[in-house]
Amino acid sequence: MNEFKSVFKNELTEYLAISQGTISDGTLQNTRRILLSFDSLLAEENAGGISEKTVNRWIGGLLQTNAPKTVSDKVSYLRKFLRYLQYEGYSVFMPDCPKTSDSYVPYIFSDGEIQMLLASADSWVGRHTDPQTRQMDMEFCMLLRMLLGCGFRLGEPLAAKVKDINFSRGTILIRHAKNNKQRIVPMDVTLTGMLEKYCIAMAIKTEPESHLFPSVRKKGAAATKGTFGLRFRKLLQETNLYVPGKAHSRGQCLHCFRHYFAIHSFAQAEKKGRPVNDSVPFLSVYLGHHDMDETEKYLKFSSDMFPEYTELFEDYAASVFMEVGDEEK
């Protein structure tokens, strides 16, 4: 049964079939979800084609419930399908991607707040007696330290398996990073030791195919982002650190730990006298960034908190972009 209902239902189905295998499963699911939304509007209007009016109505609906950046991303998905239709000989309206400015400023936890969060999370392990809950408590405590100690994206350690850890070298292989990249991430000796004890306590150290953070409900699967996201919200509320987020903003979340890591790594390198033009590129590679623009986003912080580091990074970025501009002339 075709899940699409509009006059373009066959083309939509064919487009997804062609896309399968050329993009990740997550991207394919996002594409399907977005195209289903557009297809519903086409079916509702009983449209025989794709006009400017219909496309703008769909975009207008997105703007009411999504952040500008999200709208731009969804329009980009639609544009790819519309290009496919044009290739097939259809005359369709092609919208521009709405221009957005990156206004996202992450919540930066203070050192004191981080210590408070860790202490509270650690107390959960001794508080609960249910085996599954205790397992999740242990996983949560370890995950927090890995995010803080290595600046991982949340999905990276969740996808990792025991075989990806080299305890003697203190490294972890991230096989499935953003943009289908891989990288080997060095860990601090203290974190490596803690991770080894965790694996022994979880009885997974001798199980190379075991996920580092196994699901308590589904055997052989990894714990989900949502599971830890809910636990983090509970932790924030318990420590009275919860701050309601603004509409369409990420707010306080585990991804903020990645920003915390980036900022403090940059600050630590500067305090040790390491030149900025050495530390920033290294940090960019360590975080698995595609370019310096990505790293710049992770060094967004309040100038009131770190005025000296703000100026240092801005000076470095300006010199880099000036050199690039000179080369292009």
For each of these PLM feature ranges, what is it?
Residues 1-329:
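Conserved catalytic core of the tyrosine transesterase superfamily
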